[in-house]
Amino acid sequence: GILDTIKSIASKVWNSKTVQDLKRKGINWVANKLGVSPQAA
């Protein structure tokens, strides 16, 4: 159904390279603000 289609698209977007890069940058930014290394999180 339409919901499955939306879920499928959302999953593809979420797992796309661009989003992965943004998530990593976001995590790094937050980690820097908190003064912790991303590896520790």
Swiss-Prot record:
Q: Any one cellular component term from GO for this entry?
A: extracellular region
Cellular compartment(s): Secreted
Q: Does the keyword Lyase apply?
A: no
**A GO biological process held by the record:** hemolysis in another organism
Quote the tissue specificity entry.
Expressed by the venom gland.
May I ask which residue range the UniProt record assigns to the signal sequence? none
Q: Does the keyword Secreted apply?
A: yes
Give the superkingdom in one word. Answer: Eukaryota
Q: Which UniProt keywords apply?
A: Antibiotic, Antimicrobial, Cytolysis, Hemolysis, Secreted
Function per UniProt: Antimicrobial activity against S.typhimurium, K.pneumoniae, E.cloacae, P.aeruginosa, E.coli and S.marcescens. Also shows hemolytic activity when tested in human erythrocytes.
**Family, per the entry?**
Belongs to the non-disulfide-bridged peptide (NDBP) superfamily. Long chain multifunctional peptide (group 2) family.
Q: What is this protein called?
A: Hadrurin
**Organism (species):** Hoffmannihadrurus aztecus (Mexican scorpion)
Q: Source organism lineage? A: Eukaryota, Metazoa, Ecdysozoa, Arthropoda, Chelicerata
